[in-house]
Amino acid sequence: MAKKETTAKKSAEKKVAAPKKAATKKPAAKKVVAKRIVDQTEPEHIGLVKNDSWLEPFEGAIRGRHDHAVWKLNQLTQNGKKKLSDFATGHLYFGLHKLAKGWVFREWAPNATDIYLIGDFNNWQEDEKYRCKRIEGTGNWELKLSEKALKHGQLYKMKVKWNGGEGERIPAWCRRVVQDDNTKIFSAQVWNPEKTYEFQKKNFKPKKNPLLIYECHVGMGQDAEKVGTYTEFKDNVLPRVIKDGYNCIQVMAIQEHPYYGSFGYHVSSFFAPSSRFGTPEELKELIDTAHKNGIAVIMDIVHSHAVKNEVEGLGNLAGDPNQFFYPGDRHEHPAWDSLCFDYGKDDVLHFLLSNCKYWLEEFKFDGFRFDGVTSMLYYSHGLGEAFGGYGDYFNGHEDDNAICYLTLANRMRSC
């Protein structure tokens, strides 16, 4: 037997040696390098299966999720020519912006036939001077105004028209929304204070070993029987958090919402910090103060659904109820009385990923706790599901688009 094994071994060595010899003569044989590249890019989930053999029956599903995310990443970044963070810059383009000379306003409303800005500056009437123009070949609208056309603090909305209807709407990308104390009506607000907040703590790095999180609600987390403010939280609650040894706060209900009883989870304006608690500058000061005291700040971000309100929210921005949301049976959440985002649309990904980048860069949040993840991942929204074994997580009823979105959001800073 030993002799046969030796012979077989020599024979095998000869078979391996032959292509090596040929490779020195033929440059084409260098294609073997491509095999090494492929091996190096094997998806990380292979390691998941090796670490947990119970996942082996679902390896195909895991591969599929990985491949879907890689495919979408390549599509959005032009096969790596750009970064994912470059794609997530909608907040720098859409919305109302002060320029060196004048103002510019842009909105994504492909179903609209006409858009006006109405507000304090034109007595809330349609005015040709404040009429937007559709950018040719797109669903985007644009309005350029002179320096004196708008002033800080003025209230405004869009007057949107579409085939068969019209309505007043708060712009999807607006950064400041306020509610009238008497009428209770919400409006967008021109926000361009003379003095902007400058962060004093630069390049803050959270302590993670371990991360001790204090979950809090700015409005409800204080002793007084009223809606608390960013400043009151900074002055009264943050010192107790520091004293008790926490190194992170998880802040609930920051995005603007019409109904306070929702705790902030029926969001209407995704780029506007809730004005109930104060100004954007006061929120920045709260976060900066936390950082100066070694406290990281995580934001509860709501991308699992949106409020149904049409005037305040995205429910029917320009006559198309499905502009941001799934059509048909998946349009409304069966338990939350809200609308479900269509994560399969690139424009919706653009909106949500830009929203993530906006909060990270503009307010220096250190990260997110994504709300309602189970609701996003499964067609059932997790309702009536026991999730008693791995099979329940890979039952074929998952929303691959939502999984892809969360994957991209989690990788955005590194891509």
Give names to the regions the model predicted:
Residues 32-100, 104, 125-215, 220-225, ...:
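The feature marks proteins involved in alpha-glucan
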Residues 108-115:
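Short proline/glycine-enriched turn/loop motifs at strand-loop junctions of beta-rich domains
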Residues 285-290, 405-412:
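Catalytic-core regions built around general acid/base machinery
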Residues 178, 196, 200-208, 213, ...:
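Substrate-binding/active-site clefts of carbohydrate-active enzymes
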Residues 216, 401, 408-415:
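Active-site region of glycoside hydrolase catalytic domains
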Residues 117-119:
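Conserved aromatic beta-strand anchor motif in extracellular beta-sandwich/beta-rich domains
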Residues 1-47:
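Intrinsically disordered, polybasic Lys/Arg-rich low-complexity tracts
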Residues 100-103, 234-236, 406-409:
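Short alpha-helical segments and helix-capping/turn motifs at coil-helix boundaries
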